[in-house]
């Protein structure tokens, strides 16, 4: 078994590196050392994950539990730990300092003869797994005892990274791209084969183990599996949609529904539903399960679609209404009656044991139409999105206007020959929406309001995502456009995500919450680490359906800025 010490040493070395190539080499060295049985765990650990994102498993450990566990392991009061965190700004550095001090004060004659067994990667995972499965009465005690065991069994350096792993934030800048390249380097396999294997498995841990076991041959045997969701293909906004249509000559036009993305897995009579964030939302949407059982005729299939909240006439309701259904845990049947859903299928990735993602869109479309059975009477609850193949710009505009009139967001413009690229955003799927500049940004800081809003968090520092460094880069503050109810909701959410101390009245927030923000323009600015600032930002809505890593990137910020200059 591989020691957790080696993992911690790798993390420490990477923290001191700024070069992506050097970071990749360090990760590759670690992957080569780790036993194949432990490789899935080590791979997820180095990406700040305890469990694969698709698994739905939640560690369920917050800062309060960490403070209690550290207190029990060290003898330091919780109040003192909280004070130290405010000074260091990081729970990992705090754990390091606390356990260093404890070790210094615990040197006894007997300690020279005591040899503690070395903590392994497997044991750290096992303890996290026990903590994650604890529920009901006494579950908090179980979590604390297992964390306490890890802290008392670890060195100060190991405790630093155990603490960060417990919050799934290693802060070493290792993301999917680095790990993909590290797997290729460690096991001498082409990066493009690693990438394709990741697309069909959505699990770099599985990919790493296969590459170590059997190289290219083992990777090529990996495929899509029912109930292991794959990332959804993404679209991008085009600065000149007409030019893109002319370049493609012919495009597939579909309505862009204002709903929530859903990935549907059917295996016989069993149906599982996953959200855009790949969370299992099956229990919240029993009506969709019945729709799929009734209308999807394949024995096994994975389909892509959009769930839209509708009224009694089938007219789309506000986006927030569908999110109420996705969040629902209690009184699910009653809520289904109050907020009916229309399920609109637009793609299929797998059918009856055959993977379809490498087929052109038009071939996948034929498979989709043969798989889903519906009628005019069923149209309020299910449909296959109507698709028109054309190169006529006037017809595209006509369909676009019809979509807006029907209450939808606009249209999707797709390359008819495009493959389905999980997790990828590019020119094969474009969206045409009404012109209003908005960005999806992550809250990384906040400050309390004033006057009657003094007990509410009233202003939010927002950031874009840098996929190269896995960092969030600030682009401004937003405090307008929110109702009192929205302020209360965000205050409740963010209260559990505060970390570190206040600096100039602003306190840090763990990057978990995505907001859609409208703005007038983007300006160059030395005040934020992105180098840009939003002018007149305004809150539009919370994007519960998006992970922080799905926020708009620093590259998109730069493109929007450049496009503004061209319009001057």
Curated annotation (Swiss-Prot):
It is an enzyme of class 6 (ligase). This is DNA ligase 2. CDD domains: Adenylation_DNA_ligase_Arch_LigB (cd07901), OBF_DNA_ligase_Arch_LigB (cd07972). It catalyses: ATP + (deoxyribonucleotide)n-3'-hydroxyl + 5'-phospho-(deoxyribonucleotide)m = (deoxyribonucleotide)n+m + AMP + diphosphate. It comes from Methanosarcina mazei (strain ATCC BAA-159 / DSM 3647 / Goe1 / Go1 / JCM 11833 / OCM 88) (Methanosarcina frisia). Keywords: ATP-binding, Cell cycle, Cell division, DNA damage, DNA recombination, DNA repair, DNA replication, Ligase, Magnesium, Metal-binding, Nucleotide-binding. The active site is at 256 (n6-amp-lysine intermediate). GO terms for molecular function: ATP binding; DNA binding; DNA ligase (ATP) activity; metal ion binding. One of its GO terms (biological process) is DNA biosynthetic process. Its cofactor is Mg(2+). It holds the Pfam family DNA_ligase_A_N. NCBIfam families: dnl1 (TIGR00574). Gene3D superfamilies: DNA ligase, ATP-dependent, N-terminal domain (1.10.3260.10), DNA ligase/mRNA capping enzyme (3.30.470.30), Nucleic acid-binding proteins (2.40.50.140). DNA ligase that seals nicks in double-stranded DNA during DNA replication, DNA recombination and DNA repair. ATP binds at residues 254, 261, 276, 306, 346, 425, 431. Disulfide bonds: none annotated. Belongs to the ATP-dependent DNA ligase family. Its EC number is 6.5.1.1.
């Amino acid at each position: 078994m591989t020691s957790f010490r080696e993992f911690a040493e790798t993390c420490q070395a990477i923290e001191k590196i700024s070069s992506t190539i050097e970071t990749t080499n360090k990760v590759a060295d670690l992957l080569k050392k780790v036993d194949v049985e432990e490789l899935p765990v080590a791979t997820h650990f180095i990406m700040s994950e305890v469990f694969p994102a698709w698994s739905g498993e939640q560690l369920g450990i917050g800062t309060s539990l960490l403070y209690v566990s550290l207190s029990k392991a060290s003898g330091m009061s919780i109040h003192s730990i909280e004070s130290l965190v405010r000074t260091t700004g990081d729970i990992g550095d705090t754990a390091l300092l606390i356990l260093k001090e404890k070790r210094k004060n615990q040197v006894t004659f007997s300690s020279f003869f005591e040899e503690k067994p070395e903590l392994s990667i497997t044991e750290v995972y096992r303890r996290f797994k026990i903590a994650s499965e604890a529920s009901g009465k006494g579950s908090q005690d179980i979590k604390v005892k297992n964390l306490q065991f890890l802290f008392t069994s670890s060195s100060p350096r190991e405790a630093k990274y155990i603490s960060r792993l417990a919050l799934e934030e290693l802060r070493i800048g290792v993301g999917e791209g680095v790990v993909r390249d590290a797997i290729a380097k460690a096991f001498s396999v082409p990066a493009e084969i690693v990438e394709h294997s990741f697309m069909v498995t959505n699990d770099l841990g599985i990919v790493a183990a296969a590459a170590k076991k059997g190289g290219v041959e083992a990777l090529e045997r990996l495929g899509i599996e029912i109930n292991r969701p794959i990332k959804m293909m993404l679209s991008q906004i085009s600065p000149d949609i007409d030019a893109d249509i002319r370049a493609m000559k012919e495009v597939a036009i579909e309505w862009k529904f204002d709903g929530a993305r859903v990935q549907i897995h059917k295996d016989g009579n069993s149906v599982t539903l996953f959200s855009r964030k790949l969370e299992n939302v099956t229990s919240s949407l029993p009506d969709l399960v019945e729709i799929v059982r009734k209308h999807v005729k394949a024995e096994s299939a994975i389909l892509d679609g959009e769930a839209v909240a509708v009224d009694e006439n089938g007219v789309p309701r506000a986006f927030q209404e569908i999110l109420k259904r996705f969040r629902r845990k209690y009184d699910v049947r009653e809520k289904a009656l109050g907020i009916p859903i229309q399920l609109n299928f637009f793609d299929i990735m797998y059918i009856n044991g055959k993977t379809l993602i490498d087929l052109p869109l038009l071939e996948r479309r034929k498979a989709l139409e043969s798989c889903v059975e519906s009628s005019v009477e069923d149209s309020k609850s299910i449909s296959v999105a109507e698709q028109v193949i054309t190169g006529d710009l006037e017809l595209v505009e006509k369909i676009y206007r019809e979509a807006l009139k029907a209450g939808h967001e606009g249209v999707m413009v797709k390359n008819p020959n495009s493959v389905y690229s999980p997790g990828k955003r590019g020119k094969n799927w474009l969206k045409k929406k009404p012109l209003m500049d908005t960005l999806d940004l992550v809250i990384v800081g906040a400050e309390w309001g004033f006057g009657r809003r003094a007990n509410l968090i009233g202003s939010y520092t927002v950031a874009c995502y840098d996929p190269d460094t896995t960092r969030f880069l600030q682009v401004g503050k937003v405090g307008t456009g929110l109702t009192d109810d929205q302020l209360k909701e965000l205050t409740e959410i963010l209260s559990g995500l505060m970390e570190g101390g206040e600096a100039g009245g602003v306190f840090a927030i763990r990057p978990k919450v995505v907001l859609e923000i409208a703005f007038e323009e983007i300006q160059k600015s030395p005040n934020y680490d992105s180098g840009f600032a939003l002018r007149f930002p305004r809150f539009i809505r919370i994007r519960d359906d998006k992970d922080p890593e799905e926020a708009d990137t620093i590259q998109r910020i730069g493109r929007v800025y450049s496009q503004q200059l061209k319009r001057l």
